[in-house]
Amino acid sequence: MKPAPPKIDPTKRTFVPPPPEFSLKAARNVIHAFVLVLAVTLVFEVAAWFTTSRSNLAAGCVRSGMQWVLTQALNEGNKDVQLGREGWLFAQAEINRLVHAKHDANEVHAGLIKLAARLKAQEAQLLVVAIPGRLALYPEQLRPGQYGGPVRLKDEAEKIAALKEAGIDVLDMTDALWEFRDREQIFFAQDSHWTPEAMKAIALALNKHVREKFPRLASTETPIINATILERDDAGDLSRRLDLFRPSRLLGDEAADLISIQGIEPDAKSPIVLHGGELMRVYDDPTLSFGGGDKPPKAGFATQLGTLLGRSLDVRDLPQAGDAYEDKKLVICLLPMAELVP
């Protein structure tokens, strides 16, 4: 028979406190603190309307501090840049393009067809090199999942086919770069530009294509050049769009090794024209990412391609209506796919 349990002394009972409650007073204190933070931020933002962030130290500090909290604590960007996984940043415009959100149309595709007709009358060839965007090659950094290939718009195949029907030679580098990403990184995590390794891979592919289809335009002699390796660190232009004041504090810097080449200069008399925007100018323009801000590093696409072809190129911005192509034999357009198919 089990012994009877001892009697409980009422004077020795344990007091269990009730669960804490969020009182009305505490709620008001939180609201007051939040309103105060917003008010201080608004004051500095109003001041920033009349001066830039760089000249308005207080506004710049407040913006930088608030963005640091949003990025580090809440994993949030701003209206222009979204945070992905593993420190990757993506421009909102690039996301909008792939989800068919509102975007601005352009006349690039129609302009290329017109340009091809002009060049054909002059017995010159138009060659378009299309480069995919960051999100097309690294979708898992924004939305986790297993991807068997690059993310494309349905319009891309149709637009490229129309260019080929117009007699334009098209190099769509999307699939090639998708395979190349297993060996090298194609784009930076915090910068919108391609890496020097990806740029060099495309220059090699284009050099091979030109030598096969236009052998007379490439030189068989090795040019005399002076090559120097430049080690550069940069926070990235996407980080600067989040925090212009102190971008490196958000996610740190990324590194790039540039091959600066002296001895291949642009030549307006060259039979080969190379058109391009930032894809072409990055690593040549000191004001762009990893450019150093001082003198031109001379490590961009035009320099690399000219070295491989063994001749100087007529380097220009994107095609304009009044451009002349007298005595030109080959016109190359280096374009982001987002410009070709917005």
Residue positions per predicted region:
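Extracellular glycan-modifying ectodomains
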Residues: 1-342
